Amino acid sequence: MALVLDDRVKETSTTTSTGTLSLSGAVSGFQTFVAGIGNSNTTYYAIVNRDEAEWEVGLGTVTDASTDTLARTTVISSSNSDSAVDFSAGTKDVFATLPASKVGFLDGSNNFIVGKGAAGVDYT
């Protein structure tokens, strides 16, 4: 099981509760999690309920089955005080993402910043 990142991975789901999501297929112009991430691999995900103020970002595991699934393994941030969201009814957009807390980048002063923090190392 590898950690895989890919572009333009987005599906919908109508799953409720805090458990594993059943994925409903790729949104037009995007690929499925199985096509982009692969069976049994992990990826960072975001889930956004279109009808409610519910969202979650985390690390999940993709399963290729008659109905593909995304297991919500580790919640990184959410609308539920950074705990698993008990999603209400309605359509959710589910997509691969790279959480801000996992990113390293150079700021305008060439300081290397990790995550959302303001401290870093000067590489000039």
Q: Residue spans of the language-model regions?
A:
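A generic structural signal for short, solvent-exposed coil/turn residues
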Residues: 13-15, 37, 52, 62, ...
